[in-house]
Amino acid sequence: MKISVTGATGFVGKALVADLLSKACEVNALVRQSSSELPLSVTQLVVGDLALDDSFSFLREVFSGVEVVVHTAARVHMMNDDSSVPLTEFRKVNRDVTLVLARLASELGVKRFVFLSSIKVNGEITRASHPFTPDD
C-alpha cells in the first residue's frame, strides 16, 4: 500500500512512518525541514512548509498514486509562541490547510484521508464527567 504522511518527523508522524515501513508500506514523507530522523527507506521525501506555500503545488506529486493520506502535520501548543496572532496561525495551519489537503486528496482520487488533530482541538478544559460533543 502506498501512503503519504504529512508531519512525518513530528511526535506522532515519525512513529507512524516507522510502523508503516515495518508493514512493508510505501511511504511518501512530507516534512517541513529535512531531517535525519526519518528512515532512509521512505519511498519519497518531500520538504515543504504547508503554512507558507499557499499554492500547495508540490503536494500533487506527493499525493499522486497514493491510496491513503495521513495528515499529522499541525501547529501545536508552544510555551514561547513568537507569532503576534497565535490563534490566527493555529487556525490557518490546523483548519484551513487541512481543508485544502482533504480537497486535494479527493480531487486526486485518494481513497482515504486520515486526519489526526492536535491536543488543542477541544480547547483548554477536559472534564471526565462531560464527553465532548460536535458542538463543543
Regions found by a protein language model. Give the residues of each.
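N-terminal Rossmann NAD(P)H-binding glycine-rich loop of SDR-like oxidoreductase domains
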Residues: 1-23
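SDR active-site strand-loop-helix element
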Residues: 6, 30, 69-75, 113-119
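Phosphate-coordinating loops and pocket residues in cytosolic domains that bind phosphorylated ligands
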Residues: 92, 115, 134
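Catalytic loop of short-chain dehydrogenase/reductase
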Residues: 130-136
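Conserved glycine-rich Rossmann-like NAD(P)H-binding loop of the short-chain dehydrogenase/reductase
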Residues: 25-33
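NAD(P)H-binding glycine-rich loop region in Rossmannoid oxidoreductase-like domains
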Residues: 36-39, 43, 47-96, 100, ...
